[in-house]
Amino acid sequence: MTLANIKSAKKRAVQSEKRRQHNASQRSMMRTFIKKVYAAIATGDKAASQTAFVEMQKVVDRMASKGLIHANKAANHKAKLVAQIKKLA
Protein backbone atom coordinates (compact mmCIF):
# COMPACT_ATOMS: atom_id res chain seq x y z
CA MET A 1 0.00 0.00 0.00
CA THR A 2 1.38 3.37 -0.96
CA LEU A 3 0.64 6.82 0.29
CA ALA A 4 0.78 8.23 -3.22
CA ASN A 5 -2.34 9.81 -4.72
CA ILE A 6 -1.01 10.77 -8.15
CA LYS A 7 -1.03 8.03 -10.77
CA SER A 8 2.61 8.50 -11.77
CA ALA A 9 3.69 8.46 -8.11
CA LYS A 10 1.80 5.21 -7.57
CA LYS A 11 3.52 3.71 -10.59
CA ARG A 12 6.93 4.86 -9.35
CA ALA A 13 6.22 3.33 -5.93
CA VAL A 14 5.41 -0.01 -7.57
CA GLN A 15 8.53 0.17 -9.74
CA SER A 16 10.71 1.10 -6.76
CA GLU A 17 9.43 -1.84 -4.72
CA LYS A 18 9.99 -4.22 -7.64
CA ARG A 19 13.52 -2.88 -8.10
CA ARG A 20 14.23 -3.09 -4.36
CA GLN A 21 13.22 -6.75 -4.26
CA HIS A 22 15.31 -7.57 -7.33
CA ASN A 23 18.35 -5.78 -5.88
CA ALA A 24 17.93 -7.60 -2.55
CA SER A 25 17.85 -10.91 -4.40
CA GLN A 26 20.98 -10.05 -6.39
CA ARG A 27 22.82 -8.87 -3.27
CA SER A 28 21.90 -12.07 -1.43
CA MET A 29 23.11 -14.20 -4.34
CA MET A 30 26.40 -12.30 -4.39
CA ARG A 31 26.90 -12.81 -0.64
CA THR A 32 26.23 -16.54 -1.08
CA PHE A 33 29.00 -16.80 -3.68
CA ILE A 34 31.38 -14.95 -1.34
CA LYS A 35 30.48 -17.32 1.52
CA LYS A 36 31.22 -20.30 -0.75
CA VAL A 37 34.76 -19.01 -1.24
CA TYR A 38 35.24 -18.54 2.52
CA ALA A 39 33.93 -22.08 3.10
CA ALA A 40 36.33 -23.50 0.50
CA ILE A 41 39.23 -21.62 2.11
CA ALA A 42 38.23 -22.98 5.52
CA THR A 43 38.52 -26.55 4.22
CA GLY A 44 42.06 -25.80 3.07
CA ASP A 45 41.47 -27.05 -0.47
CA LYS A 46 43.29 -24.63 -2.78
CA ALA A 47 41.80 -26.00 -6.02
CA ALA A 48 38.24 -25.75 -4.72
CA SER A 49 38.97 -22.27 -3.37
CA GLN A 50 40.24 -21.09 -6.73
CA THR A 51 37.24 -22.54 -8.56
CA ALA A 52 34.83 -20.88 -6.12
CA PHE A 53 36.78 -17.63 -6.40
CA VAL A 54 36.49 -17.54 -10.21
CA GLU A 55 32.71 -18.01 -9.96
CA MET A 56 32.47 -15.37 -7.23
CA GLN A 57 34.60 -12.94 -9.22
CA LYS A 58 32.21 -13.06 -12.18
CA VAL A 59 29.21 -12.33 -9.97
CA VAL A 60 30.88 -9.55 -7.97
CA ASP A 61 32.18 -7.83 -11.10
CA ARG A 62 28.72 -8.00 -12.70
CA MET A 63 27.12 -6.46 -9.61
CA ALA A 64 29.75 -3.69 -9.59
CA SER A 65 29.22 -2.93 -13.27
CA LYS A 66 25.46 -2.70 -12.74
CA GLY A 67 25.96 -0.35 -9.80
CA LEU A 68 24.58 -2.68 -7.14
CA ILE A 69 27.84 -2.34 -5.21
CA HIS A 70 30.69 0.13 -5.58
CA ALA A 71 33.64 -0.92 -7.74
CA ASN A 72 36.01 -0.45 -4.80
CA LYS A 73 33.94 -2.82 -2.66
CA ALA A 74 34.19 -5.44 -5.39
CA ALA A 75 37.95 -4.91 -5.55
CA ASN A 76 38.23 -5.22 -1.76
CA HIS A 77 36.32 -8.52 -1.75
CA LYS A 78 38.51 -9.95 -4.50
CA ALA A 79 41.80 -8.74 -3.00
CA LYS A 80 40.98 -10.06 0.46
CA LEU A 81 39.96 -13.48 -0.82
CA VAL A 82 42.80 -13.92 -3.30
CA ALA A 83 45.28 -13.11 -0.51
CA GLN A 84 43.77 -15.84 1.66
CA ILE A 85 43.83 -18.32 -1.22
CA LYS A 86 47.52 -17.57 -1.85
CA LYS A 87 48.28 -18.42 1.80
CA LEU A 88 46.99 -21.97 1.27
CA ALA A 89 49.68 -24.56 0.63
UniProtKB/Swiss-Prot annotation:
Keywords: Ribonucleoprotein, Ribosomal protein, RNA-binding, rRNA-binding. Pfam families: Ribosomal_S20p. Residues 1-28 are annotated as: Disordered. GO terms for biological process: translation. GO terms for molecular function: small ribosomal subunit rRNA binding; structural constituent of ribosome. One of its GO terms (cellular component) is small ribosomal subunit. SUPFAM superfamilies: Ribosomal protein S20. InterPro entries: Ribosomal_bS20, Ribosomal_bS20_sf. It comes from the Bacteria. Binds directly to 16S ribosomal RNA. Belongs to the bacterial ribosomal protein bS20 family. This is Small ribosomal subunit protein bS20. It comes from Haemophilus ducreyi (strain 35000HP / ATCC 700724). The gene is rpsT.
